[in-house]
Amino acid sequence: MREAVIAEVSTQLSEVVGVIERHLEPTLLAVHLYGSAVDGGLKPHSDIDLLVTVTVRLDETTRRALINDLLETSASPGESEILRAVEVTIVVHDDIIPWRYPAKRELQFGEWQRNDILAGIFEPATIDIDLAILLTKAREHSVALVGPAAEELFDPVPEQDLFEALNETLTLWNSPPDWAGDERNVVLTLSRIWYSAVTGKIAPKDVAADWAMERLPAQYQPVILEARQAYLGQEDRLASRADQLEEFVHYVKGEITKVVGK
């Protein structure tokens, strides 16, 4: 199954890795494919997720050239018949090994940055609480395209740090403007956070949605059902459930907080 999914995107993957190698050798230590491609299968709107580890920080010329070339290998969901959205996260070895929280991210590329990149705006290195989640994902399910396996290269993330990162993520969503236009992703991400808070593991979005569905009061189940169906390729109608959606967000945040504190 996993090999078939990777084969499905092998041409695009080769192009992306080629760009990374061209710009980052000889500082490149590892490239790991993680996310839907290796855990749960690619869905219609799934990104190709790559974690890249290097030995030194990127200079500004390399950063800009790499990002501009990555832009040519990626497309927003639904905009290309041959390209998927690509998300690339780059970390410097000594920033994350040994592990400490919160960790520093050297670079992140994704389709949400396209307009900024075209306008000449490039995100600098920054502290990123999500690295606790990302590295946990990579250690649990990933394929090393370059370098050693993730579980050999990276330290395990302590559960306390994972929970802290999950809890911090909850602060992003407080009122409808916070999820407007991104309803499906927010619903599914909340389901994953809830799943992770209870189990200490990370699941594909549709698996976490099924898990959450079994634990939700009946009045919130249509919200997660709509999100799951949209994730699998059906029409996204979540915006029409504004009141239910807001109640769902606050309910699930409350359930998560019971587990992770604050």
Curated annotation (Swiss-Prot):
Keyword ATP-binding assigned: yes
GO biological process terms held by the UniProt record: response to antibiotic
Top-rank EC class of the record's enzyme: transferase
Signal peptide: none
Gene: aadA
Pfam families named in the record: AadA_C (PF13427), NTP_transf_2 (PF01909)
Keywords: Antibiotic resistance, ATP-binding, Nucleotide-binding, Nucleotidyltransferase, Plasmid, Transferase
Name listed for the protein in its UniProt record: Aminoglycoside (3'') (9) adenylyltransferase
Disulfide bridge partners, by residue number: none
Organism this protein belongs to: Shigella flexneri
EC number(s) recorded for this UniProt protein: 2.7.7.47
Gene Ontology molecular function: adenylyltransferase activity; aminoglycoside 3''-adenylyltransferase activity; ATP binding
Catalyzed reaction equations: streptomycin + ATP = 3''-O-adenylylstreptomycin + diphosphate; spectinomycin + ATP = 9-O-adenylylspectinomycin + diphosphate
Highest taxon in the source lineage: Bacteria
Function according to Swiss-Prot or TrEMBL: Mediates bacterial resistance to the antibiotics streptomycin and spectinomycin.
Matching InterPro entries: AadA/Aad9, AadA_C, NT_sf, Polymerase_NTP_transf_dom
